[in-house]
């Protein structure tokens, strides 16, 4: 590469936004009219590249992420299992073996009874030598009957299996919408070489199997290399992670390696996304000496603090654990930060990290570069962009709130009387249609996910679960099993609906539909990623009709509706009813084991307190939010996302003010609007009264009267009341005349409903008159 002398010098990355050539880190290429590129010598590689760059030829592309090393570290740190506790797979296998033993016992009992009957008959027939031929004939007949019974049983089992494996009985229809789709214009995209990336990154990209950049990568990488703030929005599976990692690594290749500091911070909403991002970054930076650190919950706090003290180049973190280290770990800060990246910003705000993000942004230097990536751009994301970005460039790829064009969508409508058959419908589809593996099933609650995991295990289907009640090691392990193909089905909550890039996901099943269109797009976006084909199947109830209409109108391909055969549903319903006792027993065992774990944790805490009683007292830990404030924020988040009814009584009173004692929205409105809280009628009355008083004051000034005279103020109030009464009386007369005209036009007496209305109006008027009289008496008594 031909590089200018001005840009080849290495300086700090803080001044990337300035236009001066000394602080610009973009590798500029000067191409003359007829000049040709000249190959560099082998000795010049050391000047262009860092040390420890080595290139190896590999035929197979490397997978972008791998959780196996982190799982091994976590297993070393975790405690050993206590006696009497078994895993869920062991419990399921125990139930299966018990059933097999019972079946074998039943068969042995039946064979013994038949043999006893035969022996008794043979003993009785030994006395009669003349009847031997008859007994032989009877025995032959009995054997024939037994064989026939066994054949009938086998036929019934085969019929049941055939009913469960039928594929032709499902009916599929096409759902059409009235909206006309626009033609998609394909743009020519540049290659990774044309994006001016260094050779270590190009080698890593080639090893990962990336042939051509995606549209978001082609648009965002040049802007990020220029050091500009970016507000990017693209559909799920469009390659947003590499869109910000590649320019960050390109700039870090030319850093001052002698001066160690935290230069880049990447914030992500969930632990799985953070670990995936860190794994992708290690693969992209495998031919460089760039260091990174993972700061998430569920891992050792002290080990993370040690890694932060080493000053890694890149920190990938979740907001909660990062603030914990910033508040409690001495000597750790973000003073030298140069690049801040907010990935999945809409999810960060939805999960209630708004205050944490604002705190982190305040602790970062102002002359940084900020990149914000999100799949949807709502009002909250725009407000966050105004606070954190400076003159950003907006990058938008694909239409917002749309699924990819390579996705095939199917819907299964469930009637209200068949809602209890939802597990049977799911099992019938998983055993017949979606039985090739690579299927993610999304549920609304954690309990439903765990219950389906037990049902899948008892019905000989390989599945793993992913939700918030699992430990961090179990969550990573389930993702690793699904990635490696050890498990065909991944039962998950909305934890797995954002950002996870799992190769080989063929279908996504929505066991429960999400609350809004954005969550649906994120769930379905786990398949049909990066131009690959995919399929989704959603269970629709009467409450989901509005969402279904939006999906069908915005679908690029024709959506289909599938009607599952009732025979298959009945078969699996009976099968699930047989498994109810086993499911309940497994849940009871797990509840007992959970109680034992809690007791062990309390004992461990007590032992630590006793052992450290004589030691020096440590400084108390600082928390960004107390438990009460966290509960309040969670309740607010549930109300905003329609998870809990707002009318329901909550455990703690909700404080909208937040952590930093910001004045509430109501108080701000009261200061700005003097008529806040009044009805429209009361507001008009007060406005008329104020105008009338102004006019009276102006007349007094003209006449030369004193403004402070109390008698004149009373007279002005009386005048205003008289004018109001006159207006009311005139309005009442017009209403009375109109009502009389209507009655005469109707030509008859008033109906019962009309009489009730008239009586109600009269009673209201009388009550108002009584209240007004009391108020007048109170005013006069005070004066």
UniProtKB/Swiss-Prot annotation:
Binding site for ATP: 234-241
Assigned GO CC terms: chromosome; nucleolus
Function, as annotated: Probable ATP-dependent RNA helicase. Component of the nucleolar ribosomal RNA (rRNA) processing machinery that may be involved in ribosome biogenesis.
InterPro entries named among the record's database cross-references: DEAD/DEAH_box_helicase_dom (IPR011545), DEAD_box_RNA_helicase (IPR050079), Helicase_ATP-bd (IPR014001), Helicase_C-like (IPR001650), P-loop_NTPase (IPR027417), RNA-helicase_DEAD-box_CS (IPR000629), RNA_helicase_DEAD_Q_motif (IPR014014)
Biological process (GO), any one: rRNA processing
Ranges of residues in domain Helicase ATP-binding: 221-395
Biased composition (Basic residues): 762-783
Family classification: Belongs to the DEAD box helicase family. DDX27/DRS1 subfamily.
The species this protein was found in: Dictyostelium discoideum
Compositionally biased tracts (Polar residues): 1-14
Protein name listed in UniProt: Probable ATP-dependent RNA helicase ddx27
Catalytic activity annotation: ATP + H2O = ADP + phosphate + H(+)
Enzyme Commission number: 3.6.4.13
PROSITE patterns: DEAD_ATP_HELICASE (PS00039), HELICASE_ATP_BIND_1 (PS51192), HELICASE_CTER (PS51194), Q_MOTIF (PS51195)
Compositionally biased spans, kind Acidic residues: 126-149
Biased composition (Low complexity): 110-125, 156-167
Subcellular location: Nucleus, Nucleolus; Chromosome
Chain intervals for the UniProt region annotation (Disordered): 1-20, 56-173, 665-783
Domain Helicase C-terminal stretches: 406-570
Gene3D superfamilies membership: P-loop containing nucleotide triphosphate hydrolases
Motif (DEAD box): 343-346
Major location category of this protein: nucleus
PANTHER family on file: ATP-DEPENDENT RNA HELICASE DBPA, ATP-DEPENDENT RNA HELICASE RHLE-RELATED
Biased composition (Basic and acidic residues): 72-93, 688-706, 715-741, 752-761
Key words of the record: ATP-binding, Chromosome, Coiled coil, Helicase, Hydrolase, Nucleotide-binding, Nucleus, Ribosome biogenesis, RNA-binding, rRNA processing
Record note on domains: The Q motif is unique to and characteristic of the DEAD box family of RNA helicases and controls ATP binding and hydrolysis. The C-terminal domain regulates nucleolar localization.
Source superkingdom: Eukaryota
């Amino acid at each position: 590469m031909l590089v200018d002398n001005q840009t080849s010098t290495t300086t700090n990355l803080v001044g990337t936004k300035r236009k001066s050539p000394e602080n610009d880190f973009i590798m500029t290429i000067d191409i003359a009219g007829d000049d040709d590129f000249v190959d560099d010598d082998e000795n010049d590689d050391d000047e262009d590249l860092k040390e420890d760059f080595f290139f190896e030829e590999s035929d197979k592309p490397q997978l972008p992420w791998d959780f196996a090393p982190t799982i091994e570290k976590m297993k070393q740190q975790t405690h050993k299992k206590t006696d009497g506790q078994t895993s869920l797979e062991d419990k399921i296998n125990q139930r299966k073996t018990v059933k097999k033993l019972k079946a074998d016992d039943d068969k042995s009992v039946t064979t013994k009874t038949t043999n006893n009957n035969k022996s008794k008959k043979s003993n009785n027939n030994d006395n009669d030598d003349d009847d031997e031929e008859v007994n032989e004939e009877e025995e032959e007949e009995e054997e024939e009957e037994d064989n026939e019974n066994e054949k009938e049983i086998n036929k019934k089992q085969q019929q049941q299996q055939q009913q469960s494996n039928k594929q032709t009985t499902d009916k599929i229809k096409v759902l059409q919408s009235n909206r006309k789709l626009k033609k998609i214009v394909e743009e020519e995209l540049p290659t990774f070489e044309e994006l001016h990336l260094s050779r270590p990154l190009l080698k890593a990209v080639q090893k990962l199997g990336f042939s051509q950049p995606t549209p978001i990568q082609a648009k965002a990488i040049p802007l990020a290399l220029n050091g500009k703030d970016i507000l990017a929005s693209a559909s799920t599976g469009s390659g947003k992670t590499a869109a910000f990692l590649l320019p960050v690594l390109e700039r870090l290749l030319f850093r001052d390696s002698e001066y160690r500091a935290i230069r880049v911070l990447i914030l992500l909403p969930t632990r799985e996304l953070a670990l995936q991002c860190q794994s992708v970054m290690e693969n992209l930076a495998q031919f460089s000496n760039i260091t990174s650190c993972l700061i998430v919950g569920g891992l050792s706090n002290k080990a993370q603090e040690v890694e932060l003290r080493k000053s890694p180049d890149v920190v990938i973190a979740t907001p909660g654990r990062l603030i914990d280290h910033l508040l409690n770990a001495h000597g750790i800060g973000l003073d030298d930060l140069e690049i801040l990246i907010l990935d999945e910003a809409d999810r960060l705000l939805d999960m209630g990290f708004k205050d944490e993000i604002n705190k982190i942004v305040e602790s970062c230097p102002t002359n940084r570069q900020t990149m914000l990536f999100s799949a949807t751009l709502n009002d909250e994301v725009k407000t966050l962009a105004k606070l954190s970005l400076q003159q950003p460039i907006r990058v938008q790829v694909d239409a917002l709130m749309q699924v990819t064009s390579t996705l095939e969508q199917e819907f299964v409508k469930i009637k209200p009387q068949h809602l209890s058959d939802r597990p049977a419908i799911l099992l019938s589809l998983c055993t017949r249609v979606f039985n090739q593996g690579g299927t993610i099933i999304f549920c609304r609650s954690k309990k439903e996910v765990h219950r389906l995991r037990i049902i899948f295990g008892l019905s000989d289907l390989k599945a793993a679960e992913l939700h918030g009640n699992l430990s961090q090691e179990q969550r990573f392990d389930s993702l690793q099993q699904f990635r490696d193909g050890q498990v065909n089905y991944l039962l998950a909550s909305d934890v797995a609906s954002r950002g996870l890039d799992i190769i080989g996901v063929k279908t996504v099943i929505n066991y429960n539909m999400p609350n809004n269109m954005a969550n649906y797009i994120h769930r379905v976006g786990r398949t049909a990623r990066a131009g690959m084909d995919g399929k989704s199947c959603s269970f629709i109830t009467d409450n989901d009709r509005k969402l279904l209409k939006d999906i069908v109108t915005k679908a690029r391909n024709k959506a289909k509706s599938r009607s599952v055969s009732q025979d298959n549903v009945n078969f699996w319903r009976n099968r699930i009813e047989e498994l109810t006792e086993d499911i309940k027993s497994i849940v009871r065992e797990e509840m007992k084991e959970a109680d034992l774990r809690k007791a062990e944790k309390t004992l461990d805490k007590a032992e630590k307190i006793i052992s450290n009683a004589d030691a020096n007292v440590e400084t108390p830990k600082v928390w960004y939010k107390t438990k009460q404030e966290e509960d309040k924020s969670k309740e607010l988040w549930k109300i905003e996302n329609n998870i809990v009814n707002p009318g329901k009584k909550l455990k703690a009173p909700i404080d909208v003010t937040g952590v930093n004692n910001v004045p509430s929205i109501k108080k701000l409105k009261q200061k700005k609007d003097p008529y806040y809280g009044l009805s429209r009628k009361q507001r008009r009355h007060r406005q008329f009264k104020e105008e009338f008083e102004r006019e009276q004051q102006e007349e007094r000034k003209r006449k030369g009267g004193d403004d402070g005279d109390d008698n004149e103020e009373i007279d002005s109030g009386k005048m205003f009341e008289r004018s109001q009464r006159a207006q009311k009386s005139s309005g009442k007369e017009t209403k009375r005349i109109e009502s009389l005209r209507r009655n005469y036009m109707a030509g008859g007496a008033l109906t019962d409903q009309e009489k009730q209305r008239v009586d109600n109006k009269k009673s209201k008027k009388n009550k108002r008159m009584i209240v007004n009289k009391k108020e007048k008496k109170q005013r006069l008594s005070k004066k």
